[in-house]
Amino acid sequence: MRPCRSLRTAALAVVLTVLLHPVALGRATPGESEQNYLWQRRYECYASNGTQRLLDRCAYNREEFVRFDSDIGEFRAVSELGRQVAESWNLEYLQQARAEVDRVCRHNYELFQGLPVLLQTQPRVSVSPSKKGPLQHHSLLVCHVTDFYPGHVQVRWFLNGREETAGVVSTHPIHNGDWTFQILVMLEMTPHQGDVYTCHVEHPSLDSPITVEWKAQSDSARSKMLAGVGGLVLGLVSLAVGVFMHRRSKKAQQGCR
């Protein structure tokens, strides 16, 4: 099984997680009762202020049972299942585990530090009201920024070109489950006809900011716009059908000559 590596950032620390043999599925040996099991081993590296800390964590059926912490310097049981394992590994593998700080953590940290561009993912941005309602009624406008890495992002709201700072509520960056993040930034508003709200997003992966607009429209104006779009589409379809029939008729006439 190939190693799987991922780089994460956290407040005041860069966390490098290296999954070695992340999932091992097995079955009981012949003669024993048939039962599947899950074995996991994960190396976590924390880099802060020039120091490296290694956590070597082992889990059986998703429950951690033994752990090596380089700050402590030995394997320790996390559950009853890990007591004998910790004693055995401290006798057999302790020096090797202590050496992993340099082999796994420091080496991979320096490797990824040299590839900052590869560790940047551009965000996707969408804007929508929290609920539909008439104009001049209090509401929330939500700017959803997702799939970005690293986790630092700046999101600002503008109304008709002027920045809005009052009534802005934001979540903290949320992990998506891979190495990317998402964030919700909400603006309290009372929209009027013609108002233009703009979500302005700045991120290290972007050469220039992303801006997404939301225009306040009454239901009647929105209906007229949709009717206009529908009429335009219908007209284009009719034109295409007419051109097709004309060409078909022309070919038929040429074939009769």
Swiss-Prot record:
Region listing for Beta-1, in residue ranges: 30-120
Keywords: Adaptive immunity, Disulfide bond, Glycoprotein, Immunity, Membrane, MHC II, Signal, Transmembrane, Transmembrane helix
SUPFAM superfamilies xrefs: Immunoglobulin, MHC antigen-recognition domain
Protein name as catalogued: RLA class II histocompatibility antigen, DP beta chain
TM segment ranges: 225-245
Protein's organism: Oryctolagus cuniculus
Chain segments annotated as coiled-coil in the UniProt record: none
Disulfide bonds: C45-C105, C143-C199
Domain of life: Eukaryota
Membrane topology: Single-pass type I membrane protein
GO biological process, one term: antigen processing and presentation of peptide or polysaccharide antigen via MHC class II
Residue segments, region Connecting peptide: 215-224
Extracellular side: 30-224
Lineage: Eukaryota, Metazoa, Chordata, Craniata, Vertebrata
Record GO cellular component, one term: MHC class II protein complex
InterPro entries listed in its UniProt record: Ig-like_dom, Ig-like_dom_sf, Ig-like_fold, Ig/MHC_CS, Ig_C1-set, MHC/Immunoglobulin, MHC_I/II-like_Ag-recog, MHC_II_a/b_N
SMART domains reported in the protein's UniProt record: IGc1 (SM00407), MHC_II_beta (SM00921)
Glycosylation sites: N49
Assigned protein family: Belongs to the MHC class II family.
